[in-house]
């Protein structure tokens, strides 16, 4: 099955823990609403999704400097994704990193991992509530 959606995004600063990787491809996954964020060399893969898929009222406090770093000048250019942590034995244990979202300029295809200063956001937010 061929992926329907695929974009190449530049991360001038890399992402936390992978600062040397500057380009990723974000593409559809067979498991909606998740996407795959894969390094250009194919060695590193992250599962990502919009935090709004499971937390409608997600309001990250992202500094204006972070948006300027990716040249996002208006709301129509801004996209927020979060990295998903999978737990193979129990899907109910899937967590999302709300503390360090991936922010994208969808027009210029530039990204950055930002830090939300909202104290209610956790590194491991449980996606599926009981």
From Swiss-Prot:
Pfam families: FliW (PF02623). Belongs to the FliW family. Keywords: Bacterial flagellum biogenesis, Chaperone, Cytoplasm, Translation regulation. It is found in: Cytoplasm. Interacts with translational regulator CsrA and flagellin(s). One of its GO terms (cellular component) is cytoplasm. Acts as an anti-CsrA protein, binds CsrA and prevents it from repressing translation of its target genes, one of which is flagellin. Binds to flagellin and participates in the assembly of the flagellum. The gene is fliW. This is Flagellar assembly factor FliW. Its main location: cytoplasm. GO terms for biological process: bacterial-type flagellum assembly; regulation of translation.
């Amino acid at each position: 099955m061929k992926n329907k959606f695929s974009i190449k995004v530049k991360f001038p600063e890399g992402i936390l823990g992978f600062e040397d990787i500057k380009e990723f491809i974000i593409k559809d996954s067979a498991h909606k609403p998740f996407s795959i964020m894969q390094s250009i060399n194919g060695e590193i893969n992250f599962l990502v999704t919009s935090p709004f898929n499971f937390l409608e009222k997600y309001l990250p406090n992202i500094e204006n400097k972070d948006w300027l770093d990716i040249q996002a000048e208006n709301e129509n250019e801004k996209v927020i994704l979060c990295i998903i942590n999978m737990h193979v034995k129990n899907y109910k244990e899937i967590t999302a990193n709300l503390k360090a979202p991936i922010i994208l300029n969808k027009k210029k295809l530039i990204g950055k991992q930002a830090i939300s200063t909202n104290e209610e956001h956790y590194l491991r937010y449980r996606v599926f509530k009981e």
